A protein has these predicted regions:
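Interfacial helix-loop-helix junctions of multi-pass membrane proteins
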Residues: 30-39, 80-104
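Membrane-interfacial alpha-helical segments at the cytosolic side of multi-pass membrane proteins
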Residues: 47-61, 92, 106-117
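Membrane-embedded catalytic cores of phosphoryl/pyrophosphoryl-handling enzymes
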Residues: 59-81, 85
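Membrane-helix interface segments
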Residues: 5-11, 62-69, 92-96
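Short, charged juxtamembrane terminal tails flanking transmembrane helices
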Residues: 2, 118-120
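Small-residue faces within membrane-embedded alpha-helices
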Residues: 52, 70-74, 78, 102, ...
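Alpha-helical transmembrane segments of multipass membrane proteins
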Residues: 18-22, 79, 83, 107
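"…centered on the first transmembrane helix and the immediately adjacent amphipathic helix/loop
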Residues: 1-57, 70, 74
Length: 120
């Protein structure tokens, strides 16, 4: 991947991190309402699956070497996101199971990217 393309992936990744933190800053009233058709753990899994894919696009290593550091980055960011929610208040609190779903989502996203994306 050339330098310009890698830079674009890094900008996209950092922007997505900002979106995650922004949504985490919203009060429950600011979040989409309606009946919960899907478990919030599934939403966390998907959210951090995309995080893992974007992280791989931005920082992935050559094919054949599994980037465990990106999985750890996703797990760490998920934990920090939960701490952020707890710290800002707004009727939101940290949930260890949300952080676990974030870590698993990150692992799945990085794995999917590693398996299906050709990077030189």
């Amino acid at each position: 991947m050339n330098g310009i393309m890698s830079f674009k992936w890094k900008i996209l990744f950092l922007g997505y991190c900002g979106v995650i933190l922004y949504v985490s800053s919203l009060s429950p009233k600011g979040l989409p309402g309606g009946p919960a058709l899907v478990s919030d753990k599934i939403l966390h899994l998907c959210e951090y699956g995309l995080f893992g894919i974007l992280a791989w696009g931005a920082f992935g290593v050559r094919k054949g070497v599994f980037p465990w550091g990106l999985v750890v980055l996703g797990a760490w960011f998920g934990i920090m996101d939960e701490c952020w929610q707890d710290w800002i208040g707004k009727s939101r609190s940290a949930d260890v199971w949300d952080a676990a779903a974030d870590a698993v989502g990150s692992l799945l996203g990085v794995t999917v990217a590693q398996l299906f994306w050709i990077k030189r």
